[in-house]
Swiss-Prot record:
The keyword Disulfide bond applies. Disulfide bonds join C5-C23, C11-C34, C20-C39, C24-C41. GO terms for cellular component: extracellular region. Keywords: Disulfide bond, Ion channel impairing toxin, Knottin, Neurotoxin, Potassium channel impairing toxin, Secreted, Toxin, Voltage-gated potassium channel impairing toxin. Belongs to the ergtoxin family. Gamma-KTx 4 subfamily. Expressed by the venom gland. Reversibly blocks Kv11/ERG potassium channels. Pfam families: Toxin_17 (PF08086). The lineage of its organism: Eukaryota, Metazoa, Ecdysozoa, Arthropoda, Chelicerata. This is Potassium channel toxin gamma-KTx 4.13. Its main location: secreted.
């Protein structure tokens, strides 16, 4: 789910991140991006 995506995100400060994107899509969202080192899912 979405929360596990955030936990997983050791990602860059901004921008696209593959693992985060994949996780968000599995959670039913359109995409995932990084905001301040955290994964953010975009519905």
């Amino acid at each position: 789910d979405r929360d596990s995506c955030v936990d997983k995100s050791k990602c860059g400060k901004y921008g696209y991140y593959g693992q985060c994107d994949e996780c968000c899509k599995k959670a039913g969202d359109r995409a995932g991006t990084c905001v301040y080192y955290k994964c953010k899912c975009n519905p």
